[in-house]
A protein has these predicted regions:
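Boundary at the C-terminal end of the N-terminal hydrophobic targeting segment
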Residues: 27-32
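Catalytic cores of nucleophile-dependent amide-cleaving enzymes
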Residues: 158-242
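A general structural motif
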Residues: 45-47, 96-99, 153-158, 202-204
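Caspase-like cysteine protease fold
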Residues: 232-264
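Short, basic/hydrophobic alpha-helical segments
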Residues: 82-91, 145-154, 189-200
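A domain-level signal for caspase-like cysteine endopeptidase catalytic cores
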Residues: 33-143
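Bacterial N-terminal signal peptides
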Residues: 12-22
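Bacterial N-terminal signal peptides that target proteins for export
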Residues: 2-12
Length: 264
């Protein structure tokens, strides 16, 4: 009889432990291991960090292309690096770091239906794990509205802005090849940036775009509109590394000493 109760106790403890770990380990299982915690003393930030993840393409469209031209074989191209960046910021500034994550929801809803996976719940599990603010967006103007009015900008300035998603030299392509093959139906164009209230940013705010070609024109319009430089790619970017997108050679970052110039 003691053997029976002993094994029953072990089973109960296992169930409790599983329940405790499920909420914290869910996003790790989906998106990979956590980054190592920094041993460096955390710094204080008086501002807010904004991270934007654009939408993913649908495979039903991309499978019609030649393989070398296909996009988004994995649905999480713009989610995984954003999650890694959230970890980096919390390692650097501590758990009280103000982070708001803007994600284009319609693309992930349709890709969720296509893949038969609960992508929305998985994305929300990142919010829950790191205790950040998640704002679902449906239009390009939602980004500007949040920059200007998401917080009381007289009290909480923007310390950093990062974009992960499709783009061209003139626009963030918030939706791409999801509703129509090879077409963007939702975007934030560089000419719209004049609507940004430049006083929303800290003077030394760090802004980065990991979208293709945004270092060729849009980054210049960003600086003119906000007063803050944007690090961006001249040429295409590659999301093969799930932790940090890179620029495809012979392209380069617009703040690099050797800048690739597009042939005309």
């Amino acid at each position: 009889m003691s053997w029976f109760y002993h094994n029953k106790l072990i089973l109960v403890l296992a169930v409790i432990l599983s329940a405790l770990l499920s909420s914290t380990e869910k996003s790790s299982a989906i998106f990979g291991r956590n980054l190592n915690k920094s041993k460096v003393t955390t710094r204080k930030s008086s501002g807010e960090f904004i991270i934007v993840s654009g939408g993913t393409a649908l495979r039903k469209w991309e499978n019609l292309r030649k393989e070398k031209y296909q996009h988004d074989r994995w649905w999480g191209n713009f989610i995984r690096p954003a999650r890694a960046r959230i970890q980096e910021l919390q390692n650097e500034y501590g758990d009280q770091c103000k982070i708001t994550w803007l994600v284009y929801k319609p693309s992930y809803e349709s890709r969720s239906n296509e893949d038969g996976k609960p992508l929305i719940s998985w994305i929300e599990s990142v919010r829950d794990k790191y205790k950040i603010s998640l704002l679902w967006i449906t239009e390009g103007k939602d980004i500007i509205n949040y920059i200007n009015n998401g917080k009381d900008r007289s009290q909480i300035k923007i310390a950093g802005f990062e974009y992960y998603g499709h783009s061209n030299r003139h626009a963030f392509l918030i939706d791409y090849s999801n509703r129509i093959i090879g077409v963007s139906t939702v975007w934030l164009h560089e000419e719209e940036l004049t609507r940004i209230n430049r006083s929303s940013f800290l003077r030394k705010s760090k802004c980065i775009s990991y979208g293709c070609n945004t270092g060729e024109s849009m980054s210049k319009k960003w600086r003119k509109a906000t007063g803050v430089s944007m690090r961006a790619a001249i040429g295409k970017t590659d999301y093969t590394n799930p932790l940090k997108p890179t620029v495809v050679p012979p392209g380069s970052w617009n703040d690099s000493k050797s800048i690739f110039k597009r042939k005309k």
